Design a protein with these regions (language model features):
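Short, Lys/Arg-enriched N-terminal segments with co-localized hydrophobic residues
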Residues: 15-28
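Short hydrophobic alpha-helical segments enriched in small aliphatic residues
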Residues: 7-10
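N-terminal glycine-rich anion-binding loop in soluble enzyme alpha/beta folds
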Residues: 30-68
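Anionic-ligand-binding alpha/beta catalytic cores of soluble enzymes and soluble regulatory domains
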Residues: 149-223, 227-228
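Active-site histidine-anchored catalytic micro-motif
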Residues: 32, 56-62, 73-76, 87-159
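A conserved acidic, glycine/proline-rich C-terminal tail/linker
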Residues: 218-283
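Conserved active-site and cofactor/substrate-binding residues in soluble primary-metabolism enzymes
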Residues: 44, 48, 57, 72, ...
Length: 302
């Protein structure tokens, strides 16, 4: 038995007849749980999930990776998780951005060398799982004893994913007890565009706009070195029909206030920024907008 609970009362989890105090006293592990979602902080959803985790895995530290991602934007959250996972403590990752909640999309748990990933099978987990070396085992979470009974099907973060993450974090259950194994190659991938080199130009797109208005692209420094561009040079950045002459520098302090710059960001990709301002507004950029970089041509022109 993995779970004892009621629709209106989470109850007390037990395992092999051990009382909670006995189990915790001898528990061999307490993995940290890294929690990411699009729940925001205006409602009780994040707090309720924390409550479930605290009841079922009271010794596990919970790290909030972020909850302010655009609602239902799987790509945005998946990229954030991929950027973050190498800096998170090994343990359990609970990720919930689930526009397909209540449909036939699978709820999954994946075991990797880093630890466990728990969430919907909609591409959210795939890049991060690949980043840490791939999954050794993946299961479809179907065991009702590992879930909170619920009158509705719209809060799987609370009822399905949080209990599974807590059981794995506390060692209360093995991944094979959550449901049947599925082939790793059956996981829904996250389709991401690749850069394309056309002569002396590298075409990519804006991947992420952070709270400061900095715009991360999917273009790596190696992409530009292949066309003879490198730090210290001035490049031409084309967004739509507008062309900008932008210095490739190391830090914001290398340009004057209000000036546009390009630099290698904290995860190793090229980003556009404005010292003391917002590059997304200055360059009219948002996630998914095409960006092309070539050698310098001229100053900003329409």
């Amino acid at each position: 038995m993995l779970w004892v609970g009621h629709a209106r009362n989470i109850g007390t989890p037990t395992r092999l007849g051990l009382a909670v105090s006995q189990r915790l006293a001898s528990q061999p592990m307490s993995r940290p749980i890294s929690f990411l979602s699009d729940f925001g902080h205006d409602d009780e959803f994040v707090g309720v999930v924390h409550g479930v985790l605290a009841k079922l895995a009271p010794q596990s530290r919970v790290i909030d990776v972020g909850h302010g991602f655009p609602r239902g934007n799987v790509r945005s959250a998946a990229l954030a998780l991929t950027r973050s996972v190498q800096y998170l403590p090994e343990g359990v990752c609970l990720a919930v951005v689930d526009p397909g909640v209540g449909t036939d999309r699978r709820a999954i748990a994946a075991e990797t060398e880093w630890g466990f990933f728990v969430g919907p099978d909609n591409g959210l987990l795939s890049p991060a799982v690949a980043m840490v070396g791939g999954a050794g085992m993946v299961v479809s979470i179907e065991n009702p004893e590992a879930m909170i009974p619920s009158p509705g099907e719209t809060f799987h973060g609370r009822d399905v994913f949080a209990p599974a993450a807590a059981l794995l974090a506390s060692g209360e259950a093995g991944i094979d007890e959550l449901g049947p194994e599925i082939a790793g190659e059956e996981l829904v991938p996250l389709l991401l565009p690749l850069t394309e080199t056309k002569g002396s130009a590298v075409a990519g797109e804006a991947w992420w706009v952070d709270n400061f208005g900095n715009v991360q692209t999917n273009i790596a420094p190696e992409d530009l070195s292949g066309v003879g561009l490198g730090p210290g040079k001035t490049v031409t950045v084309k967004v739509g029909s507008t062309i900008y002459s932008v210095p490739w520098v190391t830090s914001y302090g290398d340009v004057g206030d209000g000036e546009v710059l390009m630099h290698v960001d904290s995860v190793g990709l090229l980003a556009l920024a404005v010292r003391g301002g917002r590059a997304d507004e200055e360059l009219n950029l948002s996630e998914g907008v095409a960006v092309t970089v070539t050698g310098s041509r001229s100053a900003k022109a329409e």
